[in-house]
Amino acid sequence: MSGLEQPAELSRVWRWLLLVSVAICAASGLVYELALVSLSASLNGGGIVETSLIVAGYVAALGVGAILVKPFLRWPAQTFLAVETLLGLIGGLSALVLYMTFAVVGQNLWMLVLATALIGILVGAELPLLMTMIQRGRLADARTTGSLVATLNAADYLGALLGGLAWPFILLPWLGMMRGAAAAGMINLLAALFVGCVLLRHLLPRAQFIRAVVALLVAIAVLGTVLVRSDGIVATARQQLYRDPVIYAHQSDYQDIVVTQRGADRRLYLNGGLQYSTRDEHRYTESLVYPGLSDSARTALIIGGGDGLAARELLRFPDMRITQVELDPEVIEVANTILLPDNGGAMQDPRVTVITDDAFTWLRAGGDGGQRYDAIFVDLPDPNNDTMARLYSQEFYTLALARLNDGGRMVVQSSSAYTTPDVFWRIASTMSAAGCGAVIPYHVHVPTFGDWGFQLCGPEGTELGLRGDTPSLRFLTDEVLAAAGVFGADNQPRELEPSTLDHPRVVEDLRRGYRQAGE
């Protein structure tokens, strides 16, 4: 007996252990890619462009890896252990390295592409190496090779399924992106160590075997350090993203939530995007809320706005009743704790009913018994990805308008009227297409945001103005509101095609605006 050849009874055990190892490695490989998708969504918005690059790049890299490994098939055992060591280390560190790169140099699509390509190439090299070991080990002959290839592919695909389930249900919620990827890398490396020590130990020269084991142990130690110390590493990197000290940071099931504070200036960020600053949030909040209230308004629906600031203003009217629909329960938790001084405990007021659900799904399902409201306020982050674009679509506004009482009004935050004018006017056109009787665009200056825009939707004849019993405000007056409806000659109203579920035009509008602003 020589080379990879095994006794018959050992061959069966060898084969099944190898198939289990294949499944584990496949699971780890998919977890690395899902970690990149999740990180892209958290840092860059993770729209169709990034996701397509990751998926297509990964699949293409699999083929490249299968080609590049050909010269090394003469040494399948040695090469397999080297590939798994690199894969576990690169995949396990990928999320952390990309996060740190983003913190230092900002958005870098090339780093995402590079990480995807490296992982894909290494994963693509696995099956040719495994098949070579199986064939040389005489675990299959001409009659059974096809069956074994099918079994090998089945193990690979089932392993990918396990990885696809483990990431959203176990690794991400329990460990987060950085530690989750590192944990997958450790599992990958431990599987490779098992294969090396149990299945391939007698097939390698002693010196090569020792070097392979030492390399695997060093890689495991590196990822173990990341698992233990990742919170501190991430905290240091995260601070580079924000000008003020971070006092709270948490990755929820939906987004990265960060609160910073310097002196009296407290700021909320979701996925790196500023939601408000206590220096000037009153300008934004008053401009969002008060134009949407008719004199008879007594019921209001807030979509988004989980910070509680819009609810705070509405509760200044004693007979107001509010339904708040917020996707992320952890934003509500932050609003009820760290942000409590800013919203005055609005989310805990008995006049406010808080619902944690996707607003589109909730409206479509007739949530709250299909109740209609006198005012609706859509206070959501900008539509920087296709998921968020659903809530800026013609279909969404149609659902929302169906929940307005006769004579009711709806206000939608509409991004920067100056930096992203196409987004601003696209939202106006989309609301008109959804059936708004009158759409009145307006904009105000919010120092931390710049020139910020809103759309007021109401019945024909609706005008910008404050209701008669409006309490004393810090910023908004009838005169300010009248001026808010005036636009310069370089930014006049324009008719654009609506943004829809089928064609979320508003996402590209936003990206184009940011690109042009950065030129």
Swiss-Prot record:
Keyword Transferase assigned: yes
Recorded metabolic or biological pathway in which this protein acts: Amine and polyamine biosynthesis; spermidine biosynthesis; spermidine from putrescine: step 1/1
Gene Ontology terms for molecular function: spermidine synthase activity; thermospermine synthase activity
Membrane topology classification: Multi-pass membrane protein
Spermidine synthase, as annotated region: 200-463
Keywords assigned by UniProt, alphabetized: Cell membrane, Membrane, Polyamine biosynthesis, Spermidine biosynthesis, Transferase, Transmembrane, Transmembrane helix
InterPro entries: MFS_trans_sf, PABS, PABS_CS, SAM-dependent_MTases_sf, Spermi_synthase
Active-site residues, Swiss-Prot/TrEMBL: D379 (proton acceptor)
Keyword check for Cell membrane: yes
Reactions the enzyme catalyzes: S-adenosyl 3-(methylsulfanyl)propylamine + putrescine = S-methyl-5'-thioadenosine + spermidine + H(+)
Subcellular location: Cell membrane
Superkingdom of the organism of origin: Bacteria
Domain PABS, first and last residues per copy: 225-459
EC supergroup of this enzyme: transferase
Residues that hold S-methyl-5'-thioadenosine according to the record: Q255, E326, D358, A359
Description of how the protein assembles with itself and partners: Homodimer or homotetramer.
The family this protein is said to belong to: Belongs to the spermidine/spermine synthase family.
Protein known as: Polyamine aminopropyltransferase
